[in-house]
Amino acid sequence: VKIVTALADTDVPVPPVVGYCEDEEVTGAPFYVMEFVEGPVLRSPDQVAQFPEAAQRREIGMNLVDTLASIHAVDPDQVGLGDLGRRDGYVERQLKRWEGQWQKSKTRELPAVETVHERLLAAVPEQGPATIVHGDYRLDNVIYNVLGEVAAVVDWELCTLGDPMADLGLLCVYWVDPGDDSIPLFQPATVEPGFPKKSELVERYVEVSGRDVSALDYFVALGYWKLAIICEGVYARFSAGAYGSEGSDGGADFDATVKMLAARALETTEKL
């Protein structure tokens, strides 16, 4: 609630906060209420049918990038978010956190995951001035209006201060171009005709932000690696029967997804 409240008077579209309650006796935990934001979340190919024109879909992609640039343009100190997190050592902390998560959740040895970790450790880019980092910025974490404009950015749980390239890198991981090799469990809306390619998104980001993206490959590799580890955690819980479907075909999909994400990360580190 602190983040969305702080961003309410900036160029970043967020849902207005109606109220916040710290009394745990009400629901069992502190909670807040936001205003309802009208509009679709574009999570899968069938959900973009309401935007049938190629020009609309292109604008959706460009508006997504423009909004990301607006997040990174906010001065954390000016909006009361200067204490949101440490400003230095962002990548090192990410590597430590997710390597630890891998050791806790892995169900088998995957050399690619370890190799990527070693390569990322050896090639940490120099960090510039820290910005607000959303932490999970992708197409289906925003709400669009009927014009294809970003009405609200949601899911700020991973927000911190750090390197803005982390957001752009993860956006490139989630943004699948038409014709790209598909990954099981990942069928994003962007595979439909009309959406800009991820290379065009990067060009747009440079245009509107003026930022140096020379380290982007590093953060794309980091994004694939983190996502592989997250999916491994889901796969571990799935395999343990936490979802009541142990042994089903879904387990095979999770297994394949982790391996493919790790392979993508490994392939990307070869560019470093």
Residues of each region from the PLM?
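Generic alpha-helical structural context detector
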Residues: 32-35, 66-69, 96, 100, ...
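Catalytic-loop of the protein kinase fold
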Residues: 132-134, 139
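Short, flexible, glycine-rich and Lys/Arg-enriched loop motifs at helix boundaries
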Residues: 43-52, 178-193
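ATP/Mg2+ or Mg2+-diphosphate-binding catalytic cores
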Residues: 104, 185-196, 200-212, 229-272
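All-alpha amphipathic helical-bundle segments outside canonical DNA-binding/catalytic cores
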Residues: 85-86, 212-223
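Catalytic activation segment of kinase domains across protein kinase-like and atypical kinase folds
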Residues: 143-171, 179-180
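ATP-binding pocket architecture of kinase catalytic cores
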Residues: 1-132, 145-148
